[in-house]
Amino acid sequence: MTSTSKLDANQLARQRKKLEKDRRKKVYDDQQVQGTNNSSIVSKRSVEKLYTQVLQPELGEWFQYFVPKGKRRSPAINRGYWIRMESIRQMVIRIIKANSPNVRINVVNLGCGFDPLAFQLLSLFKNQYNLNFIDIDYPDLVKNKYNMIQQSDEIKQLIGDQGSKSSDLYVMETDNYQLVGCDLKNLAYYKEILPKLVSRNVDPHPTSINIFIAEVSLAYMKPQFANPVIEISSQVNNSHFLILEQIMPDGATNAFATKMLYHFQHLRSPIQCVETYPTEKLQLQRFKRYYKHAEIKNLYGNWKFLIDYQMQKNISTIEEFDEWEEFIIFCQHYVIVHATHMDQLIYDDESSEEQKNEKAFSEMSLDSSVAISHDDRFNDEQLQLKFPAIASFKDKIYVNGGLKQTRNDENLEIDLQTGVITKLDQTENLPTARMCHTLTNLGENLVLIGGRSRPGVFFKDVYMFDTAKKWTRLADLPVGRSRHATVKISDHEVLIFGGLDASSSTTGDELFLLCNTNTNSYTPVKPIGDNDNHPIKNLQSACMIFDGKQGYIFGGMEDINVPIVNSKLYRFELVGENNISVTKVFDHSLLKRIGSKAHILENGDKLLIVGGVSPDQLFTKSTNIVTLDLNIFTFKSVEIPNVISEKVPPIFVGFELVQINNKASYIISGGAVCYSFGSCYNSVYKLEY
């Protein structure tokens, strides 16, 4: 028989101290999570202020009552928050419209924060549907929301009379809006109150529909707390669940994912579900444990599926925007899952893009003839630039312009032998600050062409850089170009393709232009041949390469409102003086890349393709760098080793691929703003083949 001795005074004191410490930690952690609401609603108010009156005035402006002092966010953050909010809103609207106007529909916002979705939808639908909204969050936060609502006559008028409350469950109660304080980690309490909440005034509405929303709220809870919330919610009548949550399709070492995880960890509000459910496949499995049906799309899938073309065009008019790569990568790290017991699926296809791509690329073999390594001799900070122009020249590499915090006009010289990066002295005729321009090596000089200042302002000036490291301005282009492609044709000729403003004609004589530095003139080059059947379009950020006899073009954006990205591979040859034969030779989703770079290897038999961003898939360690056999058109993967992914993960946006000789190339510069999480930049990487 064992006996348990009583705790002495010191042990009791230590126990009390530990309990108090645990209590304080829980309060602190909860406050940090609630703090994410404050940052989020400032961004949402920025979107509301800019977008709502132009796009959807019928929704009203309700964030203004919760954000006394607004701040304007960057275009990329604004667009990111807009698609995040609009995706949830559109999904709720489509579920509402799939049901009879007489059916009672409860919209339960779990971890609602100060989100005014209820007020937007009440404003939008007026009395067309029998809608009721239940906002649930931490008791302290809900009290703050209640106080803010009391100060807004517009909200009080919208939600109707606040009579005497039918139950102490409610911090606030009207016929169509209730505010409830509940820490969702208190599962027993949530399970107890939920049936009462959704059955309130339910006698006339026995077949009520219940739509649960968790917009990055369960993400802050460990799965052992978050999943029971989903399970409990699935047990009420006609349940729909909509969750917006982060994923990591390329794992936690992906550059964007690393930045995202660090951001939330740094705020002391780590996201807790993403490492358990990092893929679309695992998120679907998670919800199919509790619901008969589940469907999923990432936010870019929602941008394509839920937002019609006219709306996409209208958005382009609101603020200047040229951050497609950053927007797409952000969208590929967030998903919306819709789960339900009802036969009311919204998306066109239950299988995800991720699943389709998984099947397509699972059989791709490795190309052991190409290897990537990290070259750590350089001061990476000096090369933290997006969309500079870079070229090799006389055993050095030269870098012009690009985007730091702002666009710059600096010239850098990289010595590959010593690893030293030198900033060159400013000279006369210096090209002004710019990005998205090109630098082409003609042997005895470099030619800099075009680029842009702010989005939509394309440059048409052209410069020559000589062995004395001096710039000379040449004749201007007929029209400005940005995100264009260039290749050397001879020691005095540069072929220029695409990069025309959207208002320019998308086909025709001006698409290809030959720059002659001897005559200081430009000659339009007309596409001929197969171009009648498969006309090449004006592409921005396409890849063009040339081996002296023939060349290839792939990728690039056709329509910058969507964008539509080209998946075709074109082969071209110059014919005579003013014609170019352009033939479509292949079409594949792995070629659908914005801002990819490439080299022609093995005497014209192989393409080495590096980076870029695809709207269809997030490129991974296995698909970022691939080779394409140009005889049988099969891809092989160039695997990025873990030692690079874990230490200096690359992000293939706004970078350059510079060939040093027929055996090696360098990946230099490039980076991206990762939504509101901060920026990440490339190191220097060497490719050997």
UniProtKB/Swiss-Prot annotation:
Signal peptide: none annotated. It catalyses: 7-[(3S)-3-amino-3-carboxypropyl]wyosine(37) in tRNA(Phe) + S-adenosyl-L-methionine = 7-[(3S)-(3-amino-3-methoxycarbonyl)propyl]wyosine(37) in tRNA(Phe) + S-adenosyl-L-homocysteine; 7-[(3S)-(3-amino-3-methoxycarbonyl)propyl]wyosine(37) in tRNA(Phe) + S-adenosyl-L-methionine + CO2 = wybutosine(37) in tRNA(Phe) + S-adenosyl-L-homocysteine + 2 H(+). InterPro entries: Kelch-typ_b-propeller, Kelch_1, Ppm1/Ppm2/Tcmp, SAM-dependent_MTases_sf. It comes from the Eukaryota. GO terms for biological process: tRNA methylation; wybutosine biosynthetic process. Pathway: tRNA modification; wybutosine-tRNA(Phe) biosynthesis. Residues 14-26 have a biased composition (Basic residues). Its EC number is 2.1.1.290, 2.3.1.231. One of its GO terms (molecular function) is tRNA methyltransferase activity. It is an enzyme of class 2 (transferase). Keywords: Methyltransferase, S-adenosyl-L-methionine, Transferase, tRNA processing. It holds the Pfam family Kelch_KLHDC2_KLHL20_DRC7. S-adenosyl-L-methionine binds at R84, G111, D137, D183, L184, E215. Residues 1-33 are annotated as: Disordered. PANTHER family: TRNA WYBUTOSINE-SYNTHESIZING PROTEIN 4. Belongs to the methyltransferase superfamily. LCMT family. Probable S-adenosyl-L-methionine-dependent methyltransferase that acts as a component of the wybutosine biosynthesis pathway. Wybutosine is a hyper modified guanosine with a tricyclic base found at the 3'-position adjacent to the anticodon of eukaryotic phenylalanine tRNA. May methylate the carboxyl group of leucine residues to form alpha-leucine ester residues. This is tRNA wybutosine-synthesizing protein 4.
